[in-house]
Amino acid sequence: MEANQCPLVVEPSYPDLVINVGEVTLGEENRKKLQKIQRDQEKERVMRAACALLNSGGGVIRMAKKVEHPVEMGLDLEQSLRELIQSSDLQAFFETKQQGRCFYIFVKSWSSGPFPEDRSVKPRLCSLSSSLYRRSETSVRSMDSREAFCFLKTKRKPKILEEGPFHKIHKGVYQELPNSDPADPNSDPADLIFQKDYLEYGEILPFPESQLVEFKQFSTKHFQEYVKRTIPEYVPAFANTGGGYLFIGVDDKSREVLGCAKENVDPDSLRRKIEQAIYKLPCVHFCQPQRPITFTLKIVNVLKRGELYGYACMIRVNPFCCAVFSEAPNSWIVEDKYVCSLTTEKWVGMMTDTDPDLLQLSEDFECQLSLSSGPPLSRPVYSKKGLEHKKELQQLLFSVPPGYLRYTPESLWRDLISEHRGLEELINKQMQPFFRGILIFSRSWAVDLNLQEKPGVICDALLIAQNSTPILYTILREQDAEGQDYCTRTAFTLKQKLVNMGGYTGKVCVRAKVLCLSPESSAEALEAAVSPMDYPASYSLAGTQHMEALLQSLVIVLLGFRSLLSDQLGCEVLNLLTAQQYEIFSRSLRKNRELFVHGLPGSGKTIMAMKIMEKIRNVFHCEAHRILYVCENQPLRNFISDRNICRAETRKTFLRENFEHIQHIVIDEAQNFRTEDGDWYGKAKSITRRAKGGPGILWIFLDYFQTSHLDCSGLPPLSDQYPREELTRIVRNADPIAKYLQKEMQVIRSNPSFNIPTGCLEVFPEAEWSQGVQGTLRIKKYLTVEQIMTCVADTCRRFFDRGYSPKDVAVLVSTAKEVEHYKYELLKAMRKKRVVQLSDACDMLGDHIVLDSVRRFSGLERSIVFGIHPRTADPAILPNVLICLASRAKQHLYIFPWGGH
């Protein structure tokens, strides 16, 4: 964002974005009486606020008027709002209300998709001006947002140069206007004039103005203003439209050369000013190399009867590869409660933002929210094929009953009314006006929205009811001056996330209401409405379709998380938790301070561990350095550490060092822990139980099917692993890989190794396998090492040609020692195929193929996995190691068995 912020500020005491633009003269006749400068200043404030709200999820413009009686807005304001949305349907995005001396404009969020008038595609952003110009025959035309959007989309699709097997780089198409030959009768007459070293005063140029030619005459009295106004429009217009010639000092009607008298202009100063004006023009590239705008500037003598009379200026502008602006676009957004202008680069990035174009997304995932139909700040959301769609998740979690008001989750509601006398009566009284919908309870809606929990809050409840706006209730144990601020902040965050994360495109607000459950009497309740504004009727949910659409956006808000693909794609993409994962994630941490989570291979245990640590920070108001994540191997430790949500260590480091400041511990891949360095479980319990305010969190994630050794794990007996939850929905692997996992899991269940507790594998019959994801499973036997390496290199080459990158590939061997053994042969084969370098799993974000051991890659994943000679010292755990190997592959798995077995 630009540092120079607009002096408009968001008012903090509302559960919505409310921008106060100060006093504005309203009424058509009143506005006509204003001086033009005041009328324009008032209009600019209102338009900036409207633009910022359209681009930031919607909200309210609040302005003061001089009279209390109702008055119309004014035609100039109405017309400017219509121009802003480029539609005559003003009510689609703006509605007005008046209360006393306050005039409110309710602004719905902008969203992509077709214009209703002509079905053309809306731009991603609203802008007061694009600052993009183009030639239109003899005129310079400013592009509106719709034209700018189409122009930028076209510029973003140049020829593509492939450099290497996986880097696709846009190659700019650079052109220059051709130089003409005076002897050629077909030569361009404008270029012939441009090549001259002088012009004659009064000379009539032999060509008219056209798309390629513009004539301008200037007065030296206003030279600075002329350069400031003319150059930033005409030079970008030529650059954006095939190039052209700007002749300054030629009358545009008569084509007569007039120049400027030598007494009134310094040619060197003129050159400097024009060059400075051109070099200041913002240029945005979609290509490499990023070359500057190219032009030729000539200051030539104008002769009168053979004597120097003055000077003329000629500028030849070459076509530009991408986009040249006159200045930064006039577009606004709300950031950190300030109204800020967008930089040119940010504006172009948001205008041209599209869903990721990745082969893997189309093969593995289904789109739940697309940028092509979402609000400006939304991100694309994908779910794994075979998993619940957002509509199915909404029906599972937040279904709207046919003719009554439902309280959910029922188990939480029962707990709350058993813990707090009078709560049921208080809630039922509040719900009397509503006959259909859903009331969603939470111990803390703030925590659900990634905000900090507030002490003294019994619960929050979100009402989604027919013929009502959404209402967030906060129920306090006793009166609290900060209770209303908490409720307002939570409602504000919920409303913003429903639009900007959940992609809701309807008119929406969330009213905030605070209730106090008096300890003296269960029937007494003190309440305070936080939002004094009366929203238009269109903000109420009219029926089932509207309620379900809003609840589907709520599903994305609550179940969405940053996809691990985001780092690979270079843009933020969201995935959704499964209903089973969300059920565990939504459990009260205060009531489940210790929990064992048994998850089958590919059920999302590590994702859950990361989500739980984020929740711990908000529930217990603790810093990241007070949460410890412990795993067995260093690559997974590094991967989690890079997220900056906790302190991450390996088991060995955990047992070796003291952790005086740690309050909460999350342990992952615990089935592969050992006791060789000490009692890790005992140490973890002692650390989390030493706090004076009560025990901290100790959650342990494990999967006995992936036990890769025969030593003692240090886990307590299965009967003591309580409370315990199970993740049985397999979400990672393609169908052929999932079937292979099923087969190997059945082998383990039939004949488990001696260190796997009896009964812990009985979760297998409950396994749910997501289907519908195509993939590959190849088991290639009886190959020499050289043949294996050639096969790996050839297969990688084919995948890279299809759009995959080295970040998608892992080559896994049995032990760390074998890595060096195979590395030389693999590199030799890769170099023959002109592929890439290798690295171990400690650098998962690097642009390279991972070569490491199966054990060190535990907890990580790649789309394409090669398993070379998987074997173990004891055959009893070979099926476990094969599961560890296979479950790392999301889509394509190639196994080269040792000795053909």
Curated annotation (Swiss-Prot):
UniProt entry tagged with the keyword Nucleotide-binding: yes
Active site per UniProt: 216
Tissue specificity field: Exhibits a wider expression range in ovarian and colon adenocarcinoma than in their corresponding healthy tissues.
One GO molecular-function entry: ATP binding
GO terms (BP aspect): chromatin remodeling; defense response to virus; DNA damage response; immune system process; negative regulation of DNA replication; negative regulation of G1/S transition of mitotic cell cycle; replication fork arrest
UniProt enzyme class: hydrolase
Residues noted as binding ATP in the record, renumbered to the chain: 599-606
One of the record's GO cellular component terms: cytosol
Residue numbers binding Mg(2+): 209, 214
Annotated effect of mutating residue 753 to D: Complete loss of tRNA cleavage and ssDNA binding
Keywords assigned by UniProt, alphabetized: Antiviral defense, ATP-binding, Chromosome, DNA damage, DNA-binding, Endonuclease, Helicase, Hydrolase, Immunity, Nuclease, Nucleotide-binding, Nucleus, RNA-binding, tRNA-binding
Induction of synthesis: Down-regulated in small cell lung cancer (SCLC) cells resistant to PARP inhibitor drugs. Up-regulated by type I interferons, poly-IC and poly-dAdT.
Cofactors demanded by this protein: Mg(2+)
Outcome when changing residue 216 to A: Complete loss of endonuclease activity
Residues that, per the record, bind Zn(2+): 285, 287, 321-322
Compartment list: Nucleus; Chromosome
Superkingdom as given in the UniProt entry: Eukaryota
EC number: 3.1.-.-
Complex and partners: Homodimer. Interacts with MCM3. Interacts with DHX9. Interacts with RPA1.
Domain notes from UniProt: The N-terminus contains an endonuclease domain. The C-terminus displays homology to superfamily I DNA/RNA helicases, although it is in an autoinhibited conformation.
Family: Belongs to the Schlafen family. Subgroup III subfamily.
Miscellaneous remark of the record: Dominant determinant of sensitivity to DNA-damaging anticancer drugs: acts by mediating cell death in response to DNA damage induced by anticancer drugs. Down-regulated in a number of chemoresistant tumors.
Function: Inhibitor of DNA replication that promotes cell death in response to DNA damage. Acts as a guardian of the genome by killing cells with defective replication. Persistently blocks stressed replication forks by opening chromatin across replication initiation sites at stressed replication forks, possibly leading to unwind DNA ahead of the MCM helicase and block fork progression, ultimately leading to cell death. Upon DNA damage, inhibits translation of ATR or ATM based on distinct codon usage without disrupting early DNA damage response signaling.
Protein name (record): Schlafen family member 11
